[in-house]
Amino acid sequence: MYKNFFRYLISAIFLLGFSVNSNADFKVGFVYVGPTGDHGWTFQHHEGRNAVEAAGIKTTFVESVPEGADAERVIRQLAQSGHDLIFTTSFGYMDPTNKVAKDFPNVKFEHATGYKREHSNVSTYSARFYEGRTLLGHIAGKMTKTNTIGYIASFPIPEVIRGINA
């Protein structure tokens, strides 16, 4: 359902949000919470990164970065090394992203599934996962023999709450 979501997202950002003189001058960094071969969240971000790189834009990625101090260190290193745009691809990167963004006002930061945008150079993005969850909830409701269904949730973050409410 969201196979091409990240490709479209990244393409839209470049088409609508930035004007650059040369793709060679523009650098994009990605900070991944998991390995690129996970065939899930990180894999889809990595596919988007590959599409951006295929368009001639220089990219860098760091995979399997734990949330917390390590994330802040990696985000800061990417900003210091001249990246113009940095994608931080985990909810747990929200505070480190905002902390680093304060020190690098000329770098743009895109944070996945977060809600804090403490600086003008920080934006957030998410998919409409709740749409699929609405359909799954309807199907589960039709299948139940007890008129009871359940939902297993991880953390009370906006993305998860939207799924529960769907």
Where are these regions (language model features)?
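Extracytoplasmic "Venus flytrap"
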Residues: 29-52, 60-71, 91, 157-161
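An alpha-beta-alpha
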Residues: 49, 135-166
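Short, well-structured alpha-helical segments in soluble
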Residues: 68-82
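Periplasmic-binding protein-like
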Residues: 83-90, 110-112
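N-terminal signal peptide c-region/cleavage motif recognized by signal peptidases
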Residues: 17-21
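Flexible loop/hinge segments that line or gate small-molecule binding clefts
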Residues: 102-127
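Bacterial N-terminal signal peptides that target proteins for export
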Residues: 1-10
